[in-house]
Amino acid sequence: MSSDASLRVVVRARPMNGRETKEGASRCVQFYENTKQIVINESATFTFDAVFADTSDQESVYETTALPLLDRIFAGFNATVLAYGQTGSGKTYTMGTEDNVGTDEMRRGIIPRLVSALFQRIMNTEAPESFAVTVSMFEVYGDNVYDLLRPDKVKLNVHGDEKNCTVVNLTAVPVIDLKGALKQLAVGCHYRTKAETAMNAMSSRSHAVFTVFVEKTATAECDSAFSAKLQLVDLAGSERLKKTEAEGNRMKEGININGGLLILSQVIAALATKQKHIPYRNSVITRVLQDSLGGNSFTVFLACISPADSNSQETLNTLRYADRAKQIKNKPIVNKNPKAEEIAILQAQLKRLQKENADLKQGIAPAEVRFNDANNSAEILSLKEEVVRKTEQLKERAMKQSECIIRMSALTQKNSRLEEDKAKLQSMLTDVRNTVLNEEMLDAAEVVRSIQQVVGDTEESTTLADDDNDETALGGQDDTIYDTERLPELQAELDDLEKQIAMKDENRQKALDEQRAFIEAMQQRESEKTQLVVRISELETEMNKLRQEGKKVTTAAKLAEERRQKLKDLERQHAEDKKVLNDMKKLQETRRRMEETLKKTEDELKNLKTQRLRLLREQRAEASKFQAFKQKHEREMAQMKSKLQKRENDVAIQKRMTDQKLTVLQMRLTEANRANKTLRELNLKRANRKSSPTNASALQNMIEEELEHEMCAQRSHWLCEDLRRQRHDLMQNINTVESMKFEGGKRRRISASADPNVSVVIEGEEEFEVKRQKELTFLRASLETLNEEIKDSLRNETIAGNEERANSRWEKVPAEMRPAFEAVYAQAVAHIRKEIELEFKLARTKSEFTAKIASKASHEEKRKKEDEEMRAKYRELAQCLEDAKSGLHEKIAFLLCLIKENRVDENAIQQFESLKNQFCDVEQKVKKASRRKTTNFMGGLTPKPELQRNERARRAVKYYGNVVNSEDVTMDDSRHQKRKDHSLLAVEMNRTTDDNVKRRVAMSPIKCDDDTRLTEEDEDIENEAMNNATFVKDSFNSATIVLDDSQPSPSNSTFVIGAAPTSEADGVPPIKRKSRRTDLGPL
C-alpha cells in the first residue's frame, strides 16, 4: 500500500460471532488480499488500499495502516485514524480504545501500539528532552462535546472557522511514557457512555476522540521545531432499531448516532464529488473531524464490517461509504513554529555571511559584488567576537588536556608503586602460611595479630601512596578503585587462615575433652574400688559370725533327725489325703461341665427356635416387600409406557407442525425463485439498455420498467427477510434435535467374562440415534437450500441497488424536468415499498393464523384422546370397584356373622381393616378419575371441571336399588320448575329433599378422608395381605355362612368394631390403626 496518499481506505472484517452462527447465517463477503478487493453477494466488487479478512491479527493491521503515520508525525504533519462501521463490527477492538496496561500483547489495538512506537521513537532521538507530549480525550454524545478526562464530564464548546476547529477548555494532560498515556485512555473509557443492546453487550453510545499532541523545540544539537496532532477516532456504530431492540434512551441515542453518521456520509459524498459547499457545520462530529476529512491531515479511514449475510445491507452501505471516501483529497502541510523558523533563517544567513567573509579575506570574491560599509563592519565585528569566543574555548580545552596528561603520568607512577606493594604482600602472605603450617599449636590471637600487622602495613603503604598523590583528584579516585579491587583477595586469604586456625583450635579442644573424660573415669574407678574394699570387709565379718553359729547347731542334730522322720510320716499321710481330695474335685468339675453343656444346648435350641421364627417373619416381610417392589416397578413401567406414548404423540404433533412449516417454506422458496428470476431478467434488460430515452413513449416505458424493477427488488428484499426468519426457526429446530437425549429403559449386558456393571445397553438407543441423524440431515439440507436462496436474493438485490445506474437514470431528461421526475418517481417507489410491506405482513399474519389454527386443532385432538383414555380408565376403575364390592360384601357379611357369634380374633380384625382400607382407596381412585373428566367451556380450549350429579344419582340407584329417588339425590333444579322460583315453597322443598337424602341413604357405603388415605406402597402391602388372608372359622362349621334375609335388620344399623365388648377368653387387643369415619361407625 502506498504511504504517499493523504487519505487511505482500509477494510477489516471481524469473525462471525456466536449469535450469527446460532442463527445459521452464512458468509456473504469474499476477500482477495493480493488484489486488495472485496466481493459482496457475488455481485458487487470494491477495491481499497488494503483488505484484511476475518483471520488477520492485530499486529498486521497496525503495521499496514497506522505505522506509516509515525513518519508523518515526526515530519510535522497531522495524522488521523478513523474507524467506521456497523455496531458490533469490531471498531473498538481494532482501535484498542478499551485496552489498558494489562491487555495481552497479541490483542492490543492501534492506539496502544501507535503510542508505544511514538515514545520509543522519541527516546531514540538525539534530544528526547526537546519533545513534549500531551493527551486529551472527549466524546460527542447527543451532538454535545464532553471532556472525558474530568470526572464531572464538563460540556464543552466548539469554535472555529472553515479551515480550523478547536474544542475550548479541553483538558490536556502531559505524559512521558506509554503507561501514563494508557492510564489517561482508561480514565476516558471509564467515563465514556456505554450500554447494552441486542447486538452488542458493551455498545458505545458516543463518538470518542483520543488526541495526542507532539511538540518539539529547537536545541543546539537539532535546530528543527514542529508541532503535530494525532487523532484516533472511534465512531459509534450505525444501527437499526429493529435489530438492536432499543427502547427509551437507547432508542434516542441510536437516532442521534444515525443522524450524525448520516451527516458524515453527506460530507464524504460532498468531498468525493468536489462540491463547493461542504456541510461540516451540520453536526459536531463533522466539525471536529474537519481537518481529517479534506483538511490538513494524513488520514486512514478504517471500515469495519461483518461477513454474515444477516448484516449484508449494513456491510454493503459501509463499503459504499468507504468507496466514496477514496475520492477525498486532503492537503496536509507541516506545522512549524514561527519563532523557531525565524531562528533557523537567521542561522542560515549567518553561515552565508561567514562564508562570504572568508572569501573576501582570501580575495576571491566576485568583482561585481558591492557591500554596504555599515553592514559589513557590523558583520565583521560580530565575526571577530565569534572568533575570540572560539579561541577562548580552544584554550580551555588545551588546559584541560594538559591536566589530563599530568594525571595520567601520576596514575602511571602510582600503578608502579602498587605493583611493588603487591609483591611485598605476596611475600608476607607466604611467610604467614609457612608459620601457620610449621607451628600448628600457634595461638590464634598471635596469627590474627600478625595478619592484621601485615594488613596494617599494606594500608599504611597505601595511605602513604595516597598522601603522595593527594593533589590529583583523578589519581586518588583510581587508587580507591585499585584498593577496592585488592581488598576481596586479602579478605579471602584472611578467611582461609581463620578457617585453619579454627580447625587447630577444634582439634586441641577435642584432645582436652578426651583428657578430661579420662580423668573423670579414673576418679569414678577409685570410688568404686573403695566401696568394694568396704564390702569385702563386711562379708568377712559375716562369715566369721556364721562359723560361730554352726558350732552351736552341731549339738542338736540328733533331735532334728527324729523330728525329720516324724515329719516325713506326716507328709506321706498328707499326700494320700490330698490325692483323695483331688479325685473328689475332679468328679465335681466333670459334673459342672456336664451341667454347662446341657444349659448351652438348651440355649442353642432356644436361639435356633428364635432364629427360625425371625427368619419366617423376615421371609414374610421380604415376600411382601418383593410383591410391593414388583407392583411398584410394574406401575413405573406403566408410567414409562404412558410417557413414551405421550412423547410419541408430541413428536407426531411436532412433526406435523414441522411439515406444515416446511410446506410454507417450500412455497416461500418457490416464490423467491420466481421473484429472483424476474429480477434477474429486469436487471439484464436494464443493463442492455444503451441510454436513456428521449421521446415520451420510450420514457414512459422506461419508468414502468424501473417501477417494476423496484417492485421486484422490494419483493426480493422482503422474501429474503422472510427466509432469514424461517432460517432462524430452522436453526432452533436443529439445536433442539441436537440436544435431544434418549430416554428409555436400561438393561445390563451380562457375560461370564465381564463384570455385569461394566457395560449398559439402552434399549432403543440405536434406533433413536438413527432417527435423530436422519432428521438432522434433512434439516441441514433444508438450511443449505435456504442459504443458497438467500444468497441469490442478496445478489439480485445488490445488482438492483446499483447507485451508478440510479444516478444516470435521468441524464437524457432536460435539467428543468429532472426534479419533477425524481419527485414523482420517489413518491411512486415509496408507495410500492409500502404496498409490498403490507402484502408481506398480511401473508405473515395469515401464516401465523393458520399455524395457530393447526396448533389448536392438534391440541383439541390431543385433549380428545386424553379424555377417551380417561374415560376408559374410569370405566376400568369402576369395573374394579364393582368387582371389589361384590367380593368385599360377601367377606364383610361373613365377618359380621363371626362378630355376632363372638368368634373373631385379631387376625380377622386386621383383615377387616385391610378390606376397609382397600375399599376406601379404590373408591378414592374412582372419584379422582371422575373429577379429572373435563368438558369444553364456551367452545374454548381451557378445560373446566364439571359436577357429575346425574352420574352420581344413577350410580346410587344402581347400587342400592329403587329405594332412593334419583331426583332426591341429584337435587337437579331443572327437573322441578317450582325450585327455580325464589319462594318459601321452593326453599322448603329443597330443605325437605336434603333431609330425605341424609336420612334414607348415603352416597357411598364408606367415606374416607384425604388425610387417612394410604400411600401406594401401603396400598400394595394391604392388597397383598388381603389376597393372602383367610377368615377364622370353627372346625365344626366349615360351610359358608349365609345371612338369613327373613331376619329383620334396620337399614341404618351401626356396628362398633373397635369398641366391642371383650372377654378374657377372646383376648383380642385393641386396634392401633388410625380410625376412619364411615357410615358403619368409627373403625
Curated annotation (Swiss-Prot):
Any GO CC annotation of this UniProt entry: condensed nuclear chromosome
InterPro entries: Kinesin-like_fam, Kinesin_motor_CS, Kinesin_motor_dom, Kinesin_motor_dom_sf, P-loop_NTPase
Traits of the deletion mutant: RNAi-mediated knockdown results in embryos that undergo early mitotic divisions as in wild-type, but which later then display aberrant patterns of nuclei and arrest before morphogenesis. RNAi-mediated knockdown results in chromosome segregation defects in mitotic embryos whereby chromosomes form a disordered metaphase plate and multiple chromosomes exhibit delays in segregation resulting in the formation of bridges during anaphase. The chromosome bridges stretch, break and sometimes form micronuclei.
Tissue-level expression: Expressed in the gonad.
Positions of the Kinesin motor domain: 6-328
Subcellular locations according to the entry: Nucleus, Nucleoplasm; Nucleus; Cytoplasm, Cytoskeleton, Spindle; Chromosome
Compositional bias annotation for Polar residues: 1044-1055
Recorded GO MF terms: ATP binding; ATP hydrolysis activity; microtubule binding; microtubule motor activity
Protein name, UniProt field: Kinesin-like protein klp-19
Organism the protein comes from: Caenorhabditis elegans
